[in-house]
């Protein structure tokens, strides 16, 4: 399996693939409008906030004035997202745009507090006889979610996940086989990739598969998706009444309990509590990074005493030390973390609180054959790197910046090391990169992947037969600026653009011809 065939199951792709009529129904819910806004890139958010209180359409040419020339690629990507979601509508001439009227009205109501009382759920006004703490909710969510992951890696469990969870894992292609008799399900290639995703992506993967099954369950997919977005806007630690939910949403509660997204004292309870897994569904927070350690961080951060906080600071540290000789040491006794490491590390020795192993060509190739990518492996190692590795990396970076600045040393690209650059958010960041992992190991893992990815294919369009070199350079430079240029040959005056970029380049060529 080529590693270019990445595991894609994001909420953004799902939303963009919905019919326009379904998208319009989604925008009738203020909570959904807010959640979709949170999922947009920064420039798209800026466009929405700028046009939100405009009573007249905005000229497309004015959008260029709102962004720096260096941000044209981000502008192109943002407009592409807004068009796919039908959040912007063009007039008949194609020269002006405006926000989708339903989205505009409900998002304005959301920001001004004019939405309906139950738009974000109804808080329970009666006190609970047995109070539910945030610490308890985190513990409940951790137990539910990790039981799913442990089952996937084959850990022996006293209580296996519910049949609905097992069916979802199987229908989603994460596991295969039969769950009759002894729950004999085996993890698939997609399941291997799933394990290395961050916890938010994992949850969305299951929720989107759940959405795909709504028709078989006779459930309204819009109602289901709206409730998921409402959960992402609720307050952690608060109880909400069930009476304000629709029949479809009430029927979802049992499944959401199995995933650890909500807690109910009993099936017939008149209130439910969203867990941290639910309230961070549309959040930009990076607090929940991994299946186990990130949830443990959330658990420990809610403790109140100084002694418990000290224990939390110790447990929040990463567990993995990676040496330049490819040897790896993981200070953990978690069966789940050890099982995940075993996916791409040749483990040799196990102690009571540590495992030792080595990253080899064979272990990485086995992971690649199972559909795991080099970037996923590197990201996992960076996320779980021991705090001492991060401290040493920071010290090396500080020394390098100090040395390069004092000696006015330039980078390979010719820019001074002290030079700053602008990112997508419009803020300036240094060009230096914090290298937590040994660069030699990172490069070698990528090279082992390149051994399998010698040929890559792309869908797109070839431009050729230009009248002049000037015309070729104008179009190819524009395609490069907006990030859709895949290949160019100056001597033959040919270039190749992505499938998504053809319309933009063609429009630019038409405008040039009319001049």
From Swiss-Prot:
Broad class of the protein's primary localization: nucleus
GO CC, any one term: nucleotide-excision repair factor 3 complex
InterPro entries reported for this sequence: Tfb2_C, TFIIH_p52/Tfb2
Keywords: DNA damage, DNA repair, Nucleus, Transcription, Transcription regulation
A molecular function GO annotation: double-stranded DNA binding
Biological processes annotated in GO: nucleotide-excision repair; transcription initiation at RNA polymerase II promoter
Subcellular location: Nucleus
Pfam families: Tfb2, Tfb2_C
The protein's assembly and partners: Component of the 7-subunit TFIIH core complex composed of XPB/SSL2, XPD/RAD3, SSL1, TFB1, TFB2, TFB4 and TFB5, which is active in NER. The core complex associates with the 3-subunit CTD-kinase module TFIIK composed of CCL1, KIN28 and TFB3 to form the 10-subunit holoenzyme (holo-TFIIH) active in transcription.
Family affiliation: Belongs to the TFB2 family.
Function (record text): Component of the general transcription and DNA repair factor IIH (TFIIH) core complex, which is involved in general and transcription-coupled nucleotide excision repair (NER) of damaged DNA and, when complexed to TFIIK, in RNA transcription by RNA polymerase II. In NER, TFIIH acts by opening DNA around the lesion to allow the excision of the damaged oligonucleotide and its replacement by a new DNA fragment. In transcription, TFIIH has an essential role in transcription initiation.
Name of the protein in question: General transcription and DNA repair factor IIH subunit TFB2
Gene symbol of the encoding locus: TFB2
